[in-house]
């Protein structure tokens, strides 16, 4: 969405915007590759705070900022999964993100499953059976 939102599909825009965005994406992927030389997984926040209350009224820029912790993983092409990791004092869930090496989705999913199980957060909707 960053590339499409910035670039117009013309030959001059292609060189200016698309190629530059592709270089930045490669730099981000390279940084993750270097990080994974030192570890198997990265665990980090899924967001800058708790989940939003239903009545939250944020500006478009504030909503965009909520993606801050997830954008790099998407650009790098590495698997990442977010899970509830606990509850904040205000009663809203906190999310944790597990990031794996490229094509090592299963390892990230396994750790994410353990984090969710041990967090004690069960946010599955209650099923109400009709008569």
Could you describe each region identified by the protein language model?
Residues 3-30, 38, 75-131:
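Structural helix-boundary/capping segments
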Residues 16-20, 49-70:
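Short, surface-exposed loop/helix-turn segments at secondary-structure junctions
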């Amino acid at each position: 969405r960053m590339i499409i939102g910035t670039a117009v599909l013309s030959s001059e825009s292609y060189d200016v915007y698309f190629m530059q965005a592709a270089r930045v994406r490669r730099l981000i992927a390279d940084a993750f590759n270097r990080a994974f030389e030192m570890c198997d997984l990265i665990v980090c926040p899924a967001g800058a705070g708790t989940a939003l209350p239903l009545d939250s009224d944020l500006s478009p820029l504030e909503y965009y900022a909520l993606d801050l912790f997830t954008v790099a993983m998407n650009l790098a092409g590495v698997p990442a999964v977010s899970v509830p990791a606990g509850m904040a004092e205000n009663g809203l869930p906190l999310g944790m993100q597990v990031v794996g090496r490229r094509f090592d989705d299963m390892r990230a999913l396994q750790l994410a499953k353990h984090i969710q199980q041990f967090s004690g957060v069960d946010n599955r909707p209650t099923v109400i059976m009709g008569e």
